[in-house]
């Protein structure tokens, strides 16, 4: 890999310039990097949208409270002239306007609501409510954001690698591993937030977080992928059809179970069964996909075969190009739902410290090799694309054998790999280069978490900010990416779960304190701030995937990752609660969460229609449309939760 000495010019190049100054030539597919300023702008935009929604909620709450307070003061003035008696109080209530009696009634309801809002087994805060309202709440906000980062690091650097080892030990197929263990690794914060909401805070914060995270993944993530992609990406229908079909069924079940405000144990078991049905389908996903495509595209395959047979030598290059452009689509279409949980997320610390687009820099080291070509070679991007690469290679081979003779197309694939190597390299040199590339990949991939001091001021500042999180994890958890620590994967697995539970508890607790200070419920905090915060790592890695041209992976993973949340993140805590409490039902009554789930279902349909309207392309218009839908969802959900507007369907 070409290296450049860090100078003032290279630092300026890294921050500002699109073209290199000192001869470090970038690959033609690598134009811009996801610089830190873009990620900061992304986070600011998410916080701004959520804050705007919360401000609207707070405004309506303040207006209602001021009206009630004014009526209460006015009623007190009427009886201030003489000593209040029980008769005076009864006469006052009888002669008042309909709004006046709510002064005492509202006080009682407000006290009950305060007790309801403040309930939960949280420790006593260091700051009183008045101190938090005078500015101390900013510390809780900073701590909450810090917990978002902590959850991302512990999941990506320790939990997901330990799950990878477990899948290898159990010899689980790649599709099933992606739908189970890797999905659990990516959705662990939402799952533990739901557990805390059921057993500790006794609120619907988990439901709000999962529903809000689902909408965030579908609308905001897809919108960001459409805006940040280097080119207009064409999408294939299979992954979207597969995941959306399961997701729609799961949402319909959830809506039906929500109708009576109670979740019975068998309803939780039904949702878990739906998840196992999805896992079973993923077990045979390759066979089902190939069978469906064979039935639907039989005529197209025959045309491609006859066309190739008619003109073999003049169209050989064109056929190779078609194969190169088709293979990535099949790889994306057939990939498991949790792509960036296994491919990208276990390098989040490197994303924060060293580079925000690691695969882009690695692409530049392969000279004339294209990204899609490297994806077809065994050994390239071995660890970072461990699960994805196996699935992609398997699907490419199935595609080749289905279209024509497997051997003929395999030879073409091999010829393409030789053709894209520099012509000046002979066979031995080419093998040497391939060997060096594999060594570089192994060194990069198998290298455990490094706490080495960075070389630039920006990286050093980020390093110091993240070190209080990384160092305790590095000390307490064995890094299974180190071959000597690989055998300690059970310690890493259970230790990561403990850290995730601890960080999730702090996140929900501080979110509760922030909501209590501002005057909003935990459900709204879950729908907005917590949902966005727990989904930021998925957002960043999905954008990176989209910038690599893998639009299908970004879309299918956005939808597929929500299946785990709906069918495991919600029903598992409910089922555990029912088992512990003699199978008693779980109360899920909430002002706006039911309509929020219905709204999520409607937004999912809008996403499908929008993608179809854009002719299955991820363009800028689709991105802005997704942003608009997400903004509408936030506003409507907050207004529903605060009863500013009434839910048309009463439960």
Swiss-Prot record:
Composition-biased stretches, type Polar residues, lie in 93-103, 323-338
Q: Which Pfam families does this one have?
A: Na_Ca_ex
Q: In which tissues is it expressed?
A: Retinal cones. Found in the cone inner segment layer and in a subpopulation of ganglion cells.
The residue stretches assigned to a coiled coil in this entry are none
| Glycan-bearing residues | 112
Example of a GO MF term: calcium channel activity
Its catalytic activity? Ca(2+)(out) + K(+)(out) + 4 Na(+)(in) = Ca(2+)(in) + K(+)(in) + 4 Na(+)(out)
Q: Which cysteines are joined by disulfide bonds?
A: none
Compartments it resides in: Cell membrane
Protein origin, superkingdom:
Eukaryota
So which stretches are on the Extracellular side? 60-134, 201-206, 267-459, 509-523, 584-592, 642-651
Q: Which UniProt keywords apply?
A: Antiport, Calcium, Calcium transport, Cell membrane, Glycoprotein, Ion transport, Membrane, Potassium, Potassium transport, Repeat, Sodium, Sodium transport, Symport, Transmembrane, Transmembrane helix, Transport
Instruction: Point to the regions of Basic and acidic residues compositional bias.
Output: 104-122, 304-322
**Keyword S-adenosyl-L-methionine assigned:** no
Q: Where are the transmembrane segments?
A: 39-59, 135-155, 180-200, 207-227, 246-266, 460-480, 488-508, 524-544, 563-583, 593-613, 621-641
| Gene Ontology biological-process entries | calcium ion import across plasma membrane; calcium ion transmembrane transport; intracellular calcium ion homeostasis; long-term synaptic depression; long-term synaptic potentiation
What are the ranges of the Alpha- repeats? 176-216, 531-562
| Residue span of region Disordered | 92-123, 304-338
Function noted in UniProt: Calcium, potassium:sodium antiporter that transports 1 Ca(2+) and 1 K(+) in exchange for 4 Na(+). Required for learming and memory by regulating neuronal Ca(2+), which is essential for the development of synaptic plasticity.
Tell me the NCBIfam families matching this sequence. calcium/sodium antiporter
The entry assigns this protein to a family as follows: Belongs to the Ca(2+):cation antiporter (CaCA) (TC 2.A.19) family. SLC24A subfamily.
Name of the molecule in the record: Sodium/potassium/calcium exchanger 2
């Amino acid at each position: 890999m070409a290296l450049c000495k860090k100078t003032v010019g290279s630092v300026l190049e890294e921050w500002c310039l699109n073209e290199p100054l000192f001869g470090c030539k970038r690959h033609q597919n690598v134009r811009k990097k996801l610089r830190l300023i873009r990620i900061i702008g992304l986070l600011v935009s998410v916080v701004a949208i959520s804050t705007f929604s919360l401000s609207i909620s707070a405004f309506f709450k303040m207006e209602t409270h001021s009206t009630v307070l004014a009526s209460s003061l006015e009623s007190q003035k009427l009886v201030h002239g003489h000593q209040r008696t029980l008769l005076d109080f009864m006469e006052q209530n009888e002669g008042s306007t309909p709004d006046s009696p709510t002064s005492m009634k509202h006080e009682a309801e407000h006290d009950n609501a305060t007790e309801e809002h403040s309930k939960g087994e949280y420790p006593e805060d260091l700051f009183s409510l008045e101190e938090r309202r005078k500015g101390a709440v900013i510390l809780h906000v900073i701590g909450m954001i810090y917990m978002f980062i902590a959850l991302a690091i512990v999941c990506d650097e320790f939990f997901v690698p330990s799950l990878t080892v477990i899948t290898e030990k159990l010899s689980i197929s790649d599709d099933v591993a992606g739908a189970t263990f890797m999905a659990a690794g990516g959705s662990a914060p939402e799952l533990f937030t739901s557990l805390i909401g059921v057993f500790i805070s006794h609120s619907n914060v988990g439901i709000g977080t999962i529903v809000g995270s689902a909408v965030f993944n579908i609308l905001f993530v897809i919108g960001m992928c459409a805006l940040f992609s280097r080119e207009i990406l064409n999408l294939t229908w299979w992954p979207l059809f597969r995941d959306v079909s399961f997701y729609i069924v799961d949402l319909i079940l959830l809506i039906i179970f929500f109708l009576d405000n109670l979740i019975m144990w068998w309803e939780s078991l039904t949702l878990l069964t739906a998840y196992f049905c999805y896992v079973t389908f993923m077990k045979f996903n390759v066979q089902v996909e190939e069978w469906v495509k064979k039935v639907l595209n039989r005529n197209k395959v025959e045309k491609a075969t006859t066309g190739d047979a008619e003109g073999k030598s003049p169209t050989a290059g064109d056929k190779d190009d078609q194969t190169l452009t088709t293979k990535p689509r099949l790889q994306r279409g057939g990939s498991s739902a949790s792509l960036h949980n296994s491919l990208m997320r276990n390098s989040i610390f490197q994303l924060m410290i060293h580079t925000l687009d690691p695969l882009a820099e690695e692409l530049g080291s392969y000279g004339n090799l294209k990204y899609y070509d490297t994806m077809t070679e065994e050994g390239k991007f071995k660890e970072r694309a461990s699960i994805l690469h196996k699935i992609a290679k398997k699907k490419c081979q199935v595609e080749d054998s289905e279209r024509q003779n497997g051997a003929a197309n395999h030879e073409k694939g091999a010829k393409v790999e030789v053709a894209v190597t520099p012509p000046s390299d002979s066979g031995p040199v080419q093998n040497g280069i391939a060997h060096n590339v594999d060594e570089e990949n192994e060194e990069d991939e198998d290298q455990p978490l490094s706490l080495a001091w960075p070389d630039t001021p920006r990286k050093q500042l980020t390093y110091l900010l993240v070190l209080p999180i990384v160092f305790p994890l590095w000390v307490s958890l064995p890094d299974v990416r180190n071959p000597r620590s690989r055998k300690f994967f059970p310690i890493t697995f259970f230790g990561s779960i403990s850290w995730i539970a601890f960080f999730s508890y702090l996140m929900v607790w501080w979110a509760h304190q922030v909501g209590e200070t501002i005057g909003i419920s935990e459900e709204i905090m879950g729908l907005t701030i917590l949902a966005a915060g727990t989904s930021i790592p998925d957002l960043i890695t999905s954008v990176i995937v989209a910038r690599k041209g893998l639009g299908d992976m970004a879309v299918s993973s956005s939808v597929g990752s929500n299946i785990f949340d709906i069918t495991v993140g919600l029903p598992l805590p409910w089922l555990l609660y029912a088992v512990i409490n003699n199978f008693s039902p779980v109360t899920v009554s909430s002002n706006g969460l039911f309509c929020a789930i219905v709204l999520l279902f409607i937004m999912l349909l809008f996403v499908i229609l929008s993608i179809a309207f854009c002719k299955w392309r991820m363009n800028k218009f689709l991105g802005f449309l997704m942003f608009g839908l997400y903004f509408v969802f936030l506003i409507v959900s907050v207004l529903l939760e605060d009863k500013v507007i009434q839910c048309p369907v009463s439960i």
